[in-house]
Every structure is written in structure tokens, then in C-alpha cells.
């Protein structure tokens, strides 16, 4: 007969009328009982032949993600002119006096940030903008291109001008070496000259006038900065041949090559690969009058393209280098010919724009390393778009980068730190990631861009032929004309005006500030904000400032104090170049909303929207149907967040964890579902731990247990010998139930860790409820007053220790001096799930 929910509650000792704990609790450690209950609740995970369920409510498996919806009216968010003060350490020292070693180390990490991937795979430009919305290809192309342009204008991206130079807007940093020697002309004259050449994005651009002279005088490709990482000998010798192929799939990401060391004969010998590339490009871009390939020493090898006579009528007209402007002189092919649109304006503006500053960069191929697409800014704001950058190549495969770990405050530390009677407000840092500058050496690895409208459309429309490889004939200009394209462009013309022309050109951009799609970025942001908060706390001793990523909170004793504090801190942050969004400052009163929790003087609880999600999840959870383990991962993710607030905590979810580990489907029995549902219906706050003196001690041997409560000693025996960890856990439970003390001394590390997931399942669930809110202090066995009673010696009375307990705030503690993390030691901070062996999602 299946186990009823009421009976199951009685087994777990969750009901009031349970028998004496000393008799009932050891039974829960019995393997036979655990096995029988697991069978009754269908937790044995037999291989199921019924088809698995792949969707539960909003939860779907990892391989069936929700389809994003395209919004043609997305607004591109505006970015302030973010420029973090380069001398940020001195600025802070003027404000608070000398910084600690820890703060300096963290601030130095991001000024500038560096990125050294193991290998970089270059992708063709067509993959620059992902065809995420097949029904809105053109619209998505222009919206994304506009977003990239906005980022470039805000100084967040570099624009690749040539193989070795880039331009950007905004204020330069000292590590960005400006090009001189007449390499680029300044002001309007330069713009005039550039637009005369109609060069596009440096993909086929003319070499800078002085680049060849300059390269002879420069020792390294990044100047003095980069000489810290010299190339090893073998690499130096080979670098010429390695760097000859633009699209070599992998290459050493760091190192310096002396550009002046190679001679002109190298260029000649390498022109074969240039010719090949040039031929490919001729075919793809037939109308450029000049192609060149920059050899790795900065000289340009030029090939002049004579329009072939086979092109027919096209060769009779003057050849434009711009696909868009060619339509002006062509006969309309239909009512939907693009020439109608192009003839609407006399002046379409320049083919390309250049930034105010030009710098040298390491050799950067005309490729991208990640695709981009747009999505809603967040579930609550669908009016604005957000750019998603896919640099997942750095997190995959054999050459994946293992990103540095960093301390995330756990719930108890957070509650100890923030649960108080302070008034709170949270600050919103606008575009937090885009505050932290990247070294230009990272540019070749973090490239985004687009192939230009003509190739993008041609690739996506199956009926158009891009190229006739056999005969080398030019594609017909009007191949891309279609009703859909014409209508889309006409509508976009209202939005973008003459910028349509600029955006239809190919472009390659590299990140100048840290992008969101790389695992290094969250680490750097966390280091940066924690250092800044540390400085703020020392500058304002009566204030509590705390941050996690870009979420910064300030607490003070009174509302008036908080307001004056807010003004001072805001001014300080602005003086460092940190941009705050005053409209999004939230005043919380005495209950702070932070990291998904509501934290008040009573402790912490999950925020309301999470509780609603959990109720929703249980409402839609099917019974007696095998659920795909990937969906179980999603369910456990949600329930695991709120587990510390339930009676039985993480142990209650162990059957689900086990099914995920074994990659089996999981079937919820009505009783197990009812049990979980009840668990999550009543949530209990996690309270702040209080300091105190330990008066109660517990100890156990495999056969018996002993307690020391004040001057009283107690002992008992188990019916059968138990594993030592289980015996110690039982002793701690008896100590809590007998004395009611919230502070217990024990010599067992597993009990101290308060993770009861490795014990027999029923015992883990019951112990979690009995020991909820209990703090443990470590006492060495030799000094443990409960050691003698546990061995059956009641007459011997050891003196009670004075063991003070100080609640921990973990690595997040206010003045924690965290030493630098040596790379060869195991991680000190684990994101372990409650399992002993943390499972990694596949």
C-alpha cells in the first residue's frame, strides 16, 4: 500500500505526537526503513519506458529554450559617456587615506583588464549578426548594427580600421597608444579624404600613410606595456609563418613580435596567400577598385582590380566602391528596386565614420570571434533592447578558459551582515560592465561585426546567387532586390534616415570595455565593486555599504543620515567616473530587497515573486509521469533557492539531486509532491546568528552518545552500532531537543558544516528541522566535556570550556583581508550544491 502523506510526516517526526526522540530518531538512520520509504514514494529511479515529459509549466529542458520575440519598435538604450578615472587608486587615497593591499590589488585588476584566451577561433563576417529572427532579418540587422554603432559612439567598442589600427570615440587611456607620424589626418580634411576613397570599415581600407615607416621604429606591437610578455624563441622564429594566414584557427594570444625584424622578401614570399585571399574577396566584393592585404609588418601589398569586360553593361559606367550608391546609376529592375530608395536622397553621407582617436593594436584579422543578436532588456522592460554577445567559444572545448572563482556570500553570511535595524537604499550603476576598460591587446579575441547588408541578405535569401565561382563573373547588382527587402528598408528609412547607407557597409569592432558574454567579466566586476564598497565603508564609518556585482546597497541608522550619506557617496562615485542612474535609486525602508531575498531585522526570506513562482511550479507539476532530468534541474534550481527557509531544507530535495546525477527521469509520487508542496507553503525566516558563550556540548561513539549541559552530564546507547558521523549528528539533535540551546559544541566537522545531505535521507530531513537555527562551535575531542559521558564514564567531570562564538560573515566580511588566490592551489570557494560531489550541468 502506498505511503500516505500523514504517515510520512509521522515517520519524519514532523508531527507533535512523535515518541521520545532518543528512540525515534536513530530509527531514521536505518537503511532498511530508508529503502522501504524510497520504494513507497517511487524514489528508486527504475528505468522508465513511458516517454519523458520535457516541459513543466515554464520550465523546459536545457535543449528547448524559449523562442525570443522580436520587437520592431525596440529602442536602443543610450549610454552615458562612461570614462572610469585612470588614476582611481590615487583618487581613492585622496578621499580616505592609504588603501589596503587588498583594495589596491582588486583595483589594479581592472585598470586595465587583460584577457588571455588559450586559442581563438575566427569566424566569417556573415556570422557576425545571428539570424535569430528569420521573419525579421533586415529589421534585426539594422537594429543590431545601430546598437553596435551606439556602443562605438559611447567609447565602448573599437572600430577596426586596418589590420593594425583601430579608432574609437571618448577619452583615451595611457595604455592606448595613439598613432602619429601622419598616419591619419585629423579633422574635416581626413573625413573628406576617407569618404572619397569610400573605404569600408578597414576590411578593404587603404594603409595608413605612415604605418610602414612607423612599424620600423616601433619595437613591439603594444609599446612598453606589452614587453612584459616576450615571445618564447620558437614562437618568435615561427611567428611570420603563423601570422601569414588570416584565418589560422588558433594562435598564441599573447606575446610580442618585433615588427621591423622581417624584410621585404617575406612580403613577396607571402603574397601567394594574399593573392588567394584577394581573389576570394574580389569575387565577394567585385566593385572595390583596390584590394590590399596587410602583411604582418604593416606594409600593404596592393592588387589593382580591372573590371572584366564580361561584366557587360556594368563596366561601361564608372565603378563605385559602394554597393548602396551603385543603385543610383542603375536602371530600376522593378517597382521594388532599391534604386527607388537610393534616389530619394542626394547626400547619403560618408560610407564610413572614424573615431576621434586612432591607436595601434595587435594584428587583427577581418573576422569576428562571436555573434551578436538583440533581445528584450529584461522581462519587465520589453520596450528597450539588450545586445547579447556570444563569446561561448572561450568556455567550450579542450581549449576552454577556466574563469577565476570568486566569493559569493552565502545566505547565512548575508543575513549576519545585513539583518539589522538600519534604513536601506540601493544604487543602480548604469551599464556597470561597460565601466571597466580592457587592454587593446584583447581586441583581436573579442571581435563582433557584420558583413554588410548585401552579403547578409544574399546569404539568407536562397534564390540569390552570391557568386559564380567557375567563371568569375560579377553577381548582378539587382539580385538582392525584392519586395520584402524594399518594404523593410522603406520602413527603416523613417527610423534611421541616411544612416541606412552607413549601416549597410561591413564593419568589424572589438571591445574596449569588458563585454558581458565572457566569464571573466562577472569576476572583474565583483572585484571592482567590492573594492569600491570597502573604500566607502572606511570613508563613512557609520554606514554599511555592500555590493554583489552591480547591485550596491547603503545602510544607515536613520533616514536623514541615509539621505546625507547618499549625497556624499554619489558625489564620490561620480568623481571616480562611475555613472549612477538616479531614477533607479530604490529606498527600501527597514526591509532590504537584495539578491532575491528580503532582509530585515527578523532575518531573511525569499522575495514575493520567487514564492509566487514556486506556487506556480507546484500547481503545474505532474504526478506519476516521468519528468526529464534536465527539467528537474530547472525545478531544483528554483526550489533549492528557497530550501534553507523550509523545515527539511536541502535534504528534502535529495531524491531529485540523485536523479539528475544519474541522468534518469524522475517521477513525482502524490505523497512526495504533497510533502514538498507543504514544505514550501510555510517558509521560515533564516535568522541572524548571535555571538555567545557555548554551554552545551555533544559527543558520540559508534555505540553511544553523551551530552554536557552546563554542569549536568547525560549518556545513552544506540541499539546497533552506527557510522560515526551519523552518531555525532544524533547526539547534536539530542543536545538541541534536551537543552533548547542555539549554540552547541561538537568535534565533528560534518555536523559543523550543517550540510545534512550525505546522511540517510529520512534522518537528514528530520535533523535539518531539529537543528534549524542552531549554531555550532568546534571543540577539540580532547577538551570536549561530553567525551567522557559518550564513552560511558559519567563520574569524570572535565571543567566546562569558555568557548566564545562569533557569527561569521564569510569572505564577504567588512574588513576581510583576502590574500591573493594562487593559481595552483585548489579553489577555496566552492559553488558546491548540497551534494558531496557537486554535479556540473552538462
Swiss-Prot record:
It catalyses: DNA(n) + a 2'-deoxyribonucleoside 5'-triphosphate = DNA(n+1) + diphosphate; Endonucleolytic cleavage to 5'-phosphomonoester. Mg(2+) binds at residues 428, 550-551. Its EC number is 2.7.7.7, 2.7.7.49, 3.1.26.4. Activated by host HSP70 and HSP40 in vitro to be able to bind the epsilon loop of the pgRNA. Because deletion of the RNase H region renders the protein partly chaperone-independent, the chaperones may be needed indirectly to relieve occlusion of the RNA-binding site by this domain. Inhibited by several reverse-transcriptase inhibitors: Lamivudine, Adefovir and Entecavir. Residues 356-599 form the Reverse transcriptase domain. SUPFAM superfamilies: DNA/RNA polymerases (SSF56672). Keywords: DNA replication, DNA-binding, DNA-directed DNA polymerase, Endonuclease, Host-virus interaction, Hydrolase, Inhibition of host innate immune response by virus, Inhibition of host RLR pathway by virus, Magnesium, Metal-binding, Multifunctional enzyme, Nuclease, Nucleotidyltransferase, RNA-directed DNA polymerase, Transferase, Viral immunoevasion. Residues 346-689 are annotated as: Polymerase/reverse transcriptase domain (RT). Pfam families: DNA_pol_viral_C, DNA_pol_viral_N, RVT_1. The record marks 63 as: Priming of reverse-transcription by covalently linking the first nucleotide of the (-)DNA. Residues 223-239 have a biased composition (Polar residues). Residues 1-177 are annotated as: Terminal protein domain (TP). Residues 186-273 are annotated as: Disordered. Multifunctional enzyme that converts the viral RNA genome into dsDNA in viral cytoplasmic capsids. This enzyme displays a DNA polymerase activity that can copy either DNA or RNA templates, and a ribonuclease H (RNase H) activity that cleaves the RNA strand of RNA-DNA heteroduplexes in a partially processive 3'- to 5'-endonucleasic mode. Neo-synthesized pregenomic RNA (pgRNA) are encapsidated together with the P protein, and reverse-transcribed inside the nucleocapsid. HAMAP family: HBV_DPOL. Belongs to the hepadnaviridae P protein family. This is Protein P.
